[in-house]
A protein has these predicted regions:
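Primarily interfacial, aromatic-capped hydrophobic alpha-helices that serve as membrane anchors
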Residues: 158-201
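Interfacial helix-loop-helix junctions of multi-pass membrane proteins
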Residues: 139-160
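Membrane-interface loop-to-helix entry segments
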Residues: 79-94, 164-176
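Membrane-interface amphipathic/juxtamembrane segments adjacent to transmembrane helices
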Residues: 32-58
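Cytoplasmic juxtamembrane regions at transmembrane-helix boundaries
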Residues: 94-120, 189-202
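Alpha-helical transmembrane segments of multi-pass membrane proteins
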Residues: 127-134
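N-terminal signal-anchor transmembrane alpha helix
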Residues: 2-38
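Individual transmembrane alpha-helix segments
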Residues: 56-92
Length: 202
């Protein structure tokens, strides 16, 4: 496992970045829009009525921000997507792939990897890259709906369902990938126990 320390460090940094976005950046934006959560934090997104309320909250805050000369929630939301949330998805994707790989990596006691475990590893990679696509496209759609320029127009209601599907897809693929990683590590622990000879009686 010593050879894998850069990967574990990357995982720690990824978790730290997620915690910072979820506990610092997102609440700061929510505070400006009456406590409503940004779409990224809702596993099933907003329905049409919820999206209308969120749009109105962003628009109201934008007017207040322009009058007060401060950054609006909408601008902060776009900045989040252009900054931290631009870096996080690829980091999380790499971390998922690494955790799956680490479960199969045993150079000190090489064992044949069963086909089922190899398939599980492949599925983790497929889910991780699907998550990556969903997250990036979700951010782009959300920006086009709640960005400062969009707030001067009517809400694009056709995008509401699209955003919900992308958000649900993001959460579903990441949860399934994590579940498969747990299964791979359980397989690893069971394999190690079976390969360890019983202690000789004294």
């Amino acid at each position: 496992m010593k050879r894998l320390w850069p990967g574990w460090l990357l995982c720690v940094l990824t978790v730290g970045l997620l915690a910072y976005m979820g506990c610092v950046k997102a609440p700061a934006i929510s505070l400006l829009i009456g406590g409503m959560k940004i779409p990224d934090l809702l596993p099933f997104g907003y329905d049409l009525d919820g999206a209308r309320s969120l749009f109105a909250a962003f628009a109201s805050d934008l007017a207040d921000a322009q009058a007060g000369g401060r950054q609006s929630a909408s601008e902060a939301y776009l900045a989040l997507h252009a900054g931290y949330d631009l870096v996080f998805p690829p980091l999380f994707t790499i971390s998922l792939g690494f955790c799956a790989f680490a479960a199969l990596f045993r150079p000190e006691k090489p064992i044949e990897t069963p086909r089922l475990a190899a398939v599980g590893f492949g599925l983790v990679l497929a889910l991780a890259f699907t998550y990556l696509a969903c997250d990036f496209i979700e951010n782009a759609v959300a920006d086009s709906m709640f960005g400062p320029k969009a707030l001067g127009l009517a809400l694009n209601e056709q995008f509401v369902f699209v955003l919900r599907v992308l958000t649900a897809g993001k959460y579903t693929t990441s949860i399934l990938a994590l579940a498969l990683i747990v299964a791979l590590w359980v397989w690893r622990l069971v394999s190690v126990r079976r390969a360890t000879p019983p202690a000789a009686p004294t």
